Design a protein with these regions (language model features):
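Basic, amphipathic N-terminal segments
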Residues: 1-428
């Protein structure tokens, strides 16, 4: 009987798991059907046709590549999506990584072309998809929304199980330094909508990395970079952690990030002084100038990844600084205005702190994600089924033990009544 009960429990668990898988598959198909319905209404749109052809060409290139030696070419490497408004410097940052790509010209002197819809970057350890800034712009129109949804449909078709391994959210330092709360929150809200779409589409909360571009506009950044070696300039500059969930979690994460970053900058500054490196006034003030970005970044993060009872809370993983092109000027701060500026050594189109971010940080984080938190109907049903099953099993086991005890006691009583002489003989 015990074996039978165990078999029933195992069978029930397998049925629940199978039912959940069927439900997930049907829901994914339903989402695809919705996207396809929208696409059919715009099937004659040449922009969408170009988008589909471009995607298929890149996927075919992947399928025919040597990655098939290691398994499904679409699943061998992690995939990352890069989003940010037009002019934020995301395409420049990817171009200046100094990483090899099989289909893109990534020379340091290569001209930066605006992203039409999306561009693929096939790096050796990761696949990066750079998306058009208009997809996440507060001024986006209906056609931009249709293109974005088509892109999600294609992404779902290509990687139905794996989805995205991470999302890089790009915002430039100039916007953060200006600290226009209304604009930053508006930008963050639009990005939050796109992030929530992706989370619901793939049923997981993937890591999100905030990349602050155009960091050369921070007073002292370029002068400080000029004191570092080539190897140091390839390293990532930022903070990696896991934000807690709940109200104010993004603020706590931001506080830890800026404390960690500025402390390391101060230690490096001290180390430079000990080694006899000439420290200009901008280099001395650089850690303090970095702190000027914090208020604006707080406004942006609260709208982009802050807790919201109606939305899934994104998994904030890291904050990083980078520069793909040094303009030779910076946004003056309060402290820098009282000092005489030092001449800037021009470093034309040099990628700073980008190589390891795209080449090591992102690929190393593959497989890091959290399940969604909002309870949907299926989770409620499966949880209730689990409780009912657990109670049923406990009732069955208890009933079995009670019945066994009663049957054994009855049998012993019958034996004692049938052979009373044996008991008497034993006593003599």
């Amino acid at each position: 009987v015990t074996f039978a009960l165990t078999a029933i429990v195992v069978a029930l668990a397998l049925l629940i798991r199978l039912a959940r898988r069927i439900w997930i598959t049907r829901r994914s198909r339903f989402k695809l059907a919705q996207s396809e319905a929208v696409a059919r209404r715009h099937s004659g749109n040449p922009i969408l046709l170009d988008l589909v052809d471009k995607w298929k060409a890149s996927v075919d290139l992947l399928r025919k590549s040597s990655l098939k030696r290691f398994g499904n070419p679409l699943r061998v490497l992690p995939w990352y999506l890069v989003v940010g408004e037009s002019g934020s410097g995301k395409t420049t940052a990817i171009t200046r990584t100094r990483l090899t790509s099989v289909v893109k010209n990534i020379a340091q002197s290569a001209p930066i072309l605006q992203t039409g819809n999306f561009d693929w970057w096939f790096f050796s350890k990761a696949i990066v998809i750079d998306t058009a800034g208009r997809y996440v712009s507060p001024q986006s129109v209906e056609s931009d929304q249709i293109e974005w949804e088509k892109l999600l449909e294609l992404l779902t078709r290509s990687r139905p199980k794996d989805g995205l391994d991470g999302l890089v959210v790009v915002i430039d330092a100039e916007r953060l330094l200006q600290n226009n709360a209304e604009q930053l929150q508006q930008c963050g809200r639009v990005l939050r909508e796109r992030i929530d779409q992706l989370i619901r589409l793939f049923d997981r909360r993937f890591p999100i990395y905030v990349l602050i571009t155009k960091s050369d506009l921070i007073t002292g950044f370029t002068q400080w970079a000029n004191t570092l070696s080539e190897d140091q300039l390839e390293q990532a500059m930022g903070y990696l952690g896991v934000a807690k969930q709940g109200d104010g979690s993004e603020g706590d994460f931001l506080a830890k990030a800026f404390t960690s970053i500025t402390d390391r900058l101060k230690h490096l500054r001290l180390d430079m002084g000990v080694k006899g490196v000439v420290l200009t006034s901008e280099v001395l003030l650089f850690p303090s100038e970095v702190q000027r970005l914090r208020p604006g970044l707080q406004q942006f993060l609260s709208a982009c990844v802050g807790n919201n009872p109606y939305l899934e809370q994104p998994l904030l993983r890291g904050i990083f600084f980078a520069s793909g092109r040094q303009a030779g000027t910076s946004v003056a701060g309060i402290l820098s205005e009282v000092l005489r500026p030092s001449p800037i050594k021009q470093t034309a189109d040099h990628g700073l702190f980008l190589h390891d971010f795209f080449g090591s940080i992102l690929p190393r984080d593959r497989g890091i994600f959290l399940p969604t938190q909002i309870v949907n109907r299926w989770n409620q049903v499966t949880r209730n089924l689990a409780w009912v099953s657990w109670l049923a099993v406990n009732v069955a086991i208890t009933s079995f033990l009670l019945l066994s005890y009663a049957a054994t006691k009855s049998t012993l009583s019958q034996i004692e009544a049938a052979f009373p002489a044996i008991d008497a003989h034993t006593q003599v």
